[in-house]
Amino acid sequence: MKHKVGILGGTFDPPHLAHLRMAEEAKKQLGLEKILFLPNKIPPHKHISGMASSDERVEMLQLMIEGIDSFEIDTRELMRTGKSYTYDTMRDMISEQPDTDFYFIIGGDMVEYLPKWYHIDDLVKMVTFVGVNRPSYQTEVPYDIVKINMPETTISSTEIRNNIENASTFLPEKVWSYIKEHQLYGKK
């Protein structure tokens, strides 16, 4: 019997409670053994200035998932030079773990963008995409996507960075403390 592993990729700049809830709900609803958080270095679709360093983002992720044995961090995309493509990462993971079915978890904002992903026609044969509802985004695309139910949330890393003074309620307590201690996103 194959293992069932979820993957939640993103910049995690910063990681927030909606990321945690997405991972928990996907694990529970799909019966996944574990969730791999996959922070990326240079997402092909984003151009971000003022972002936290790779090390800071990994540290915040570690603080967020601390004590949850079935949640892990995979930093392979941070080690790459150039842009990070999910296709390349999944090709490598499948080669390393041929006895595993991978479930790639994406929010509504990414479902809408899915047809533009690099090698998407090959990628949909390699993984099962799991779409999580997000307000104001279309979740209908010409690919098979497993949808999971989750209370809708409007939390986004961009909004947190842009309104850092009022962000504590959207962040795990340890992540909020880290942001304050390291004065990230202009927080003093």
Swiss-Prot record:
Family matches, as SUPFAM superfamilies: Nucleotidylyl transferase (SSF52374)
Enzyme class: transferase
Swiss-Prot/TrEMBL keywords: ATP-binding, NAD, Nucleotide-binding, Nucleotidyltransferase, Pyridine nucleotide biosynthesis, Transferase
InterPro entries on file: Cyt_trans-like, NadD/NMNAT, Rossmann-like_a/b/a_fold
Lineage: superkingdom: Bacteria
GO molecular function, one term: ATP binding
Reactions the enzyme catalyzes: nicotinate beta-D-ribonucleotide + ATP + H(+) = deamido-NAD(+) + diphosphate
EC number(s) per entry: 2.7.7.18
CDD domains listed in its UniProt record: NMNAT (cd02165)
A Pfam family recorded for this sequence: CTP_transf_like
GO biological process: NAD biosynthetic process
Presence of keyword Transferase: yes
PANTHER family reported in the protein's UniProt record: NICOTINATE-NUCLEOTIDE ADENYLYLTRANSFERASE-RELATED, PHOSPHOPANTETHEINE ADENYLYLTRANSFERASE
Protein purpose: Catalyzes the reversible adenylation of nicotinate mononucleotide (NaMN) to nicotinic acid adenine dinucleotide (NaAD).
Entry-linked NCBIfam families: cyt_tran_rel, nicotinate (nicotinamide) nucleotide adenylyltransferase, PRK00071.1-3, PRK00071.1-4
Family the UniProt entry places it in: Belongs to the NadD family.
Designated name of the protein: Probable nicotinate-nucleotide adenylyltransferase
Protein's organism: Listeria monocytogenes serotype 4a (strain HCC23)
Lineage: Bacteria, Bacillati, Bacillota, Bacilli, Bacillales
